[in-house]
């Protein structure tokens, strides 16, 4: 019984010593992130599609915040993201020109021709937001609520059964743009 308490005490002491070492190391060797990069990264849609020329949203945010990259390269975010970044960085909004892919004015949605789908799962692997579901050698389908229309699933398809189609706005698919609604703060007097 005495050896059990010695073992418990030794393990507790080791845990405390190593915990203190890890705590010291985490503070001593901590890397501070740039708060501007964090804010830019929060603005981006996090689709990790690579249409901006960077492997994901975080590297693009670092390029904009630290290297002065253009703010109009995010195709899925379009003009709304560009305007938010321009406001954050206090720069002039930049219209999309011929070099950058201009965001489509209509939301695009990937559609799979299920009769020609062979179930190879290449589109599932290419989708950055997991909007395509299906199993090996079974037909796949796109979940329209998750699809960003980034076009990354079209090229890997060996049977070319995926295409992007515009989504027609219906009362069910239309959403309020909350950034355009004017909001006023009305002061309220409190009576004692």
From Swiss-Prot:
Native source species: Salmonella schwarzengrund (strain CVM19633)
Cofactor binding description: Binds 3 [4Fe-4S] clusters.
Residues annotated as domain 4Fe-4S ferredoxin-type: 108-137, 138-167
Lineage, broadest ranks: Bacteria, Pseudomonadati, Pseudomonadota, Gammaproteobacteria, Enterobacterales
Spans annotated as Hydrophobic: 1-26
EC number from the UniProt entry: 7.-.-.-
Protein name (Swiss-Prot/TrEMBL): Ion-translocating oxidoreductase complex subunit B
Sample GO molecular function, one term: electron transfer activity
Compartment annotation: Cell inner membrane
């Amino acid at each position: 019984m005495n050896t059990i308490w010695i073992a418990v005490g030794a393990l507790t002491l080791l845990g405390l010593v190593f915990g203190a070492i890890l705590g010291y190391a985490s503070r001593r060797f901590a890397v501070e992130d740039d708060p501007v990069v964090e804010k830019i990264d929060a603005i981006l849609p996090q689709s990790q599609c690579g249409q901006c020329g960077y492997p994901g949203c975080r590297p693009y945010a670092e390029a904009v915040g630290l290297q002065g990259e253009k703010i109009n390269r995010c195709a899925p975010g379009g003009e709304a993201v560009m305007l938010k970044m321009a406001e954050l960085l206090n720069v002039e909004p930049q219209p999309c020109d011929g070099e950058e892919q201009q965001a489509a004015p209509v939301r695009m949605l990937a559609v799979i021709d299920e009769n020609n789908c062979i179930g190879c799962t290449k589109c599932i692997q290419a989708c950055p937001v997991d909007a395509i579901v299906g199993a090996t050698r079974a037909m796949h389908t796109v979940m329209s609520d998750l699809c960003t229309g980034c076009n990354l699933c079209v090229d890997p398809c060996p049977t070319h059964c995926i295409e992007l189609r515009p989504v027609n706005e219906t009362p069910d698919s239309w959403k309020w743009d909350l950034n355009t609604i004017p909001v006023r703060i009305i002061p309220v007097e409190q009576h004692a």
